[in-house]
């Protein structure tokens, strides 16, 4: 049984006794001395390679003199922390959660240790199977939760599910990319533009920049310069980074003679497109099938299909609309910058 329900049950039983408490004592039971803390920040991940997103975010929030918790990298751990604080009569006005995220793989934060990444599907399943901590609504009913997760605000369904899990008064996330520790601003938002190519089969920056021009004809960005610039170098100018998305399936046949002969990439793509299971995955990703590098292999009676695409992400910092030479102020209350539910 959830602890918050136990507390309510005990209070009702005690107040239902034959000898009434004094009004002062009854008030003390119903209205405990609650401490309201302005905010807390959960750094829900750790830096890998040369990506310093988490350490930059930590430095930013330290300068804001906000309490920071590190080492809690799962939603279960964060909920347990909030529950424990609530049991000790501590509430938070704002909870900030810093976690990597992208439009295809969901949040990098896990549901539990060694568990699945946070997506709509994984959260719904965890709630259904009681594999996720339950939070007491009284602890977060008046709390605003802000997710600093790139592009999460585009995924209204996932943000809605997170609001349900945290039982929060309000949740917010930006559809744009969060950048901490920038050259010209310690925290700013940037609009992403995407392109794709089969991993290790790039046709070069000139060809790719032409694809960006065709896909975004009304966007005034020097695509060639952006694609060859890997970090923020000039004020307000676009730059880019890349990452890979792999897909893999295994199919076991009763008889190896029933296995299709996939001689080349075209044969693999034909077979993938005719499979409802694989076609559904690619449809959800919204990445063209020809943008994957396809490979097949056989292990006994098992056919293994692997695909991998490289995502090129061009980031354009969002500037003040009044023409000032400044990046747009990051205000969570600004609905033009944040999805607020």
Per-region residue spans from a language model:
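Sec-dependent N-terminal signal peptides
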Residues: 4-13
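Sec/Tat signal peptide C-region and signal peptidase I cleavage site
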Residues: 18-22
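A domain-level signal for caspase-like cysteine endopeptidase catalytic cores
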Residues: 23-81, 87
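A general structural signal for stabilizing positions within well-ordered secondary structure
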Residues: 85-86, 136
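Low-complexity, serine/threonine/proline/glycine-rich extracellular segments that form mucin-like
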Residues: 88-92
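Catalytic cores of nucleophile-dependent amide-cleaving enzymes
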Residues: 93-183
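Active-site-proximal C-terminal subdomain of hydrolase catalytic domains
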Residues: 144-326, 332-339
